Amino acid sequence: MKPFRIGIDERTLGPLGLSPFETLDWAIMNEAEGVQFSGGAGPAPDRSFLRELAQYAEENRLYLEWGGGEYVPFDPATGRPRDIAAVNRAAAEQAHTLGVDTVCAAAAGPKRWEKGPGTADERLRLSARSLRELGPMLRDLGVTLALETQSAFTTFDLLRLFEMCDVRPGEYLGICLDTMNALTTLEDPAEAAGRVLPWVVTTHINDGATLLAEDGFVTFAAEAGTGVVDLETIIGKLGTLDHGINLSLEDHAGGVSVPAFAPGFPAAFPDLA
């Protein structure tokens, strides 16, 4: 197995309210090997700030990964369609300035089982159309948009999305593998990782578990080794990749309510039937 560099996702330190430079200092003091800023660095950081951040990371031998992208073209508050081109261009240009070749993109739209706008399959097609339009820009900047595995789509869906975009591993789209989010889409995390393995370019490494609830169950993050995610198998799979992968540890509070007992809920997951 190839050696990994192990760092953190900046959201892990959210309660501390650290600036990007303070986050790098935390990584240095705690012997982390890098930081993924999966949410970017706030509103429109200028180029001089980004260059100084990249230089500081390099001086301290830290890997740096970037985020702030989105891949579901719907407003999470209203559910209405919206253009995601500008936010992805900004994130990709920031990554390019930093000398980083990936941008983590979140799925801010409805969860797969939620109604409207449209069906999950229709939302997938609209997402693919939006991402196809980003291809030339991402190629020009040499940046891969890493779609985080979240509750908007299953890994089966994401493979269909890549097919709709006529893209292959190593091109302008990839995966940010969140090891526990598969629990929210009723997938086995290790099997989900295997499905999208060639596409994985960045990671959110975390353990998790589920608890029964009145309407189904709740998924939540757990201390590594205490949950149900087979991290040993997943990391073993990542170690077979030809390209280098960093392991960015992510921890966060809260859980996701999955209404598995609701009428018609299983129909939202045809690949798992």
Show which residues each predicted segment covers:
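A short, structure-level motif marking secondary-structure boundaries and short turns
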Residues: 7-10, 37-39, 75-77, 118-120, ...
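Conserved, mostly hydrophobic/aromatic
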Residues: 8, 27, 35, 57, ...
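Acidic-and-aromatic substrate-binding clefts and catalytic sites of carbohydrate-active enzymes
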Residues: 13-18, 37-49, 72-84, 111-115, ...
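N-terminal pre-domain/capping segments
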Residues: 1-100, 270-273
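A short, hydrophobic secondary-structure junction motif
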Residues: 28-38, 92-95, 127, 131, ...
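Active-site acidic/histidine proton-transfer and metal-coordination neighborhood
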Residues: 58-59, 63, 77-174
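Hydrophobic faces of well-ordered beta-strands that scaffold small-molecule active sites
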Residues: 4-11, 35-37, 64-69, 103-105, ...
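Histidine-acidic metal/acid-base catalytic patches
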Residues: 1-5, 20-28, 155-174, 183-273
